[in-house]
Amino acid sequence: MEEEKYLPELMAEKDSLDPSFVHASRLLAEEIEKFQGSDGKKEDEEKKYLDVISNKNIKLSERVLIPVKQYPKFNFVGKLLGPRGNSLKRLQEETGAKMSILGKGSMRDKAKEEELRKSGEAKYAHLSDELHVLIEVFAPPGEAYSRMSHALEEIKKFLVPDYNDEIRQEQLRELSYLNGSEDSGRGRGIRGRGIRIAPTAPSRGRGGAIPPPPPPGRGVLTPRGSTVTRGALPVPPVARGVPTPRARGAPTVPGYRAPPPPAHEAYEEYGYDDGYGGEYDDQTYETYDNSYATQTQSVPEYYDYGHGVSEDAYDSYAPEEWATTRSSLKAPPQRSARGGYREHPYGRY
């Protein structure tokens, strides 16, 4: 116990001694070196043999000098600790070694440090030494030396007096994040730059999300969902930048034959002139399918004797009147394969 107190007392007395007492200072320095040398010899005798067969844990310790004398204006302690001490904690986790910043200048409060140094307690004896980093490893021999080597290589990066190196930049970003400035800056930065999200509200029909409205025009029809109606080919999904599919009555695939035109009353019923009017939206797919099936079956009924349709009724379906009535829509192709319209055999009676 007396030997443990002896060295701190010598160091405290040396620091408190006036520089004018040259010989006294020299004698104290020699005594301190002698005492430290004896401790080093005892440690060397204990470490004379290394047992690697039993693989017992050994303790390694090294003191790494911090170059404060060469670079007195650089804050090495702050760089080693990092924001809230996180840099030193991560360094210990990565290397598996215990690291402590000791020596003169290791405490922030200089008055408190001087008071503890003069107290003469053994645990504060390091305050009389030079500023250094104590690295301690407790592991099996092979792993212990490997950890120590790794720790020495990593601690060397923190002792470079560079304000703009990668370690310093990372610490500044971490400090900004901890202070909350990064979150507030990110909130201001995205104002007016957000990504527009398409509406996901379901439409009134059977389809999914409401597609973006096409340019205003007459006869433009947007598919309402993915259900395929009778007599029509499947409609591919509408993507951004792709033209809106054409209205009913125009072929969507080359070679597709358009169905015969419906009666004029059908256009008034579905409200094609109003574009996206309420009359069209209220119609369901069943109503559309029934009307479409009716108009496709009306071709063979032209020659049914029970109807007694006059010749004027056939003239109202002429292609010329179709084109003039609906000039905004594309006229269907001429059906030359059927040979045109024939007169009713009993129309003269």
Curated annotation (Swiss-Prot):
GO terms for biological process: mRNA processing; regulation of alternative mRNA splicing, via spliceosome. Residues 65-135 form the KH domain. Residues 182-284, 319-349 are annotated as: Disordered. Residues 340-349 have a biased composition (Basic and acidic residues). The modification Omega-N-methylarginine is found at residues 230, 240. Highly expressed in brain, lung, kidney and small intestine. Weakly expressed in placenta, liver, spleen, thymus, ovary and colon. CDD domains: KH-I_KHDRBS2 (cd22469). PROSITE patterns: KH_TYPE_1. It is found in: Nucleus. Its main location: nucleus. It comes from the Eukaryota. Keywords: Methylation, mRNA processing, Nucleus, Phosphoprotein, RNA-binding, SH3-binding, Transcription, Transcription regulation. Methylated. Tyrosine phosphorylated by FYN, PTK6 and SRC. Tyrosine phosphorylated by SRC during mitosis. Pfam families: KH-I_KHDC4-BBP, Qua1, Sam68-YY. One of its GO terms (molecular function) is poly(A) binding. One of its GO terms (cellular component) is nucleus. RNA-binding protein that plays a role in the regulation of alternative splicing and influences mRNA splice site selection and exon inclusion. Binds both poly(A) and poly(U) homopolymers. Phosphorylation by PTK6 inhibits its RNA-binding ability. Induces an increased concentration-dependent incorporation of exon in CD44 pre-mRNA by direct binding to purine-rich exonic enhancer. Self-associates to form homooligomers. Interacts with KHDRBS1/SAM68; heterooligomer formation of KHDRBS family proteins may modulate RNA substrate specificity. Interacts with RBMX. Interacts with SAFB, SFRS9 and YTHDC1. Interacts with FYN and PLCG1 (via SH3 domain). Interacts (phosphorylated) with FYN, GRB2, PLCG1 and RASA1 (via SH2 domain). Belongs to the KHDRBS family. This is KH domain-containing, RNA-binding, signal transduction-associated protein 2.
